[in-house]
């Protein structure tokens, strides 16, 4: 089970239309992941394309000692969906 900040989840729901727990199932499936090194966050952050709620989602998360912590999630844009389906055509 992934951890998340409930206030951040509410903010994510307002901004992107989905609460953070809605993306959690993507952590259990195939994901395209890269490190987000665009800023100095003080911890290693990842951006992943995964499958949750019947669609491709984009998650920002960090891997902590007690497991993954979700930072944000949203439905993938068209170019991101194409990249995911190229990597995982059986989806």
Give the location of each predicted region.
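Ribonuclease/tRNase effector modules and their secretory precursors
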Residues: 1-91
């Amino acid at each position: 089970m992934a951890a998340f900040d409930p206030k951040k989840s509410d903010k994510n729901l307002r901004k992107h239309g989905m609460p953070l727990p809605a993306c959690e199932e993507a952590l259990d499936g195939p994901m395209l992941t890269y490190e987000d090194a665009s800023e100095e966050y003080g911890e290693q952050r990842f951006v992943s394309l995964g499958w949750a709620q019947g669609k491709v989602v984009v998650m920002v998360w960090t891997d902590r000692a007690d497991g993954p912590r979700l930072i944000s999630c949203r439905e993938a844009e068209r170019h991101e969906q194409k990249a995911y389906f190229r990597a995982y055509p059986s989806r």
